[in-house]
Amino acid sequence: MTDQQTNGAAAEDNSPQFSLQRIYVRDLSFEAPKSPQIFRQTWEPSVALDLNTKQKSLEGDFHEVVLTLSVTVKNGDEVAFIAEVQQAGIFLIANLDAPSMSHTLGAFCPNILFPYAREALDSLVTRGSFPALMLSPVNFDALYAQEMQRMQEAGEAPTVQ
């Protein structure tokens, strides 16, 4: 019976593991260079969103994923505000093959972080006395597939730092 329990435990150790350890804000910034004059103008905003992800291997099977959302909102030709959040998470990921690990870090983890980043960004904008910023959901699987296609065409290999 002891041998069966030991063998069962060994089999479990080889099964894929995924666990969210921590979610945190790594960096947060807000600038409203034309305040307070911008509040007296007719509000006709144009929004530019820049999204980026980075991964870094930590000790053992732990990985940090950082999702950066940068938003620049202009009212006419003037910058109304610039807001940026770096939402990060520490994930325990083990026993995945290289393609699965790459997809998990490049799409699955950012998908978990996005609602937190979106909320932090929206809170920042409303605290600056601007209208709420309602960012649409992001298809990280599609973005990941596009990046893999780009890397394949360029002859690059996906890496985890």
UniProtKB/Swiss-Prot annotation:
Origin: domain of life: Bacteria
The protein, known as: Protein-export protein SecB
Family matches, as PANTHER family: PROTEIN-EXPORT PROTEIN SECB (PTHR36918:SF1), PTHR36918
Protein keywords: Chaperone, Cytoplasm, Protein transport, Translocation, Transport
Gene Ontology molecular function: unfolded protein binding
An individual GO BP term: protein tetramerization
Similarity comment: family membership: Belongs to the SecB family.
Pfam families xref list: SecB
Task performed by this protein: One of the proteins required for the normal export of preproteins out of the cell cytoplasm. It is a molecular chaperone that binds to a subset of precursor proteins, maintaining them in a translocation-competent state. It also specifically binds to its receptor SecA.
SUPFAM superfamilies, A to Z: SecB-like
A GO-annotated cellular component: cytoplasm
Subunit structure, as described in the record: Homotetramer, a dimer of dimers. One homotetramer interacts with 1 SecA dimer.
Entry's localization field: Cytoplasm
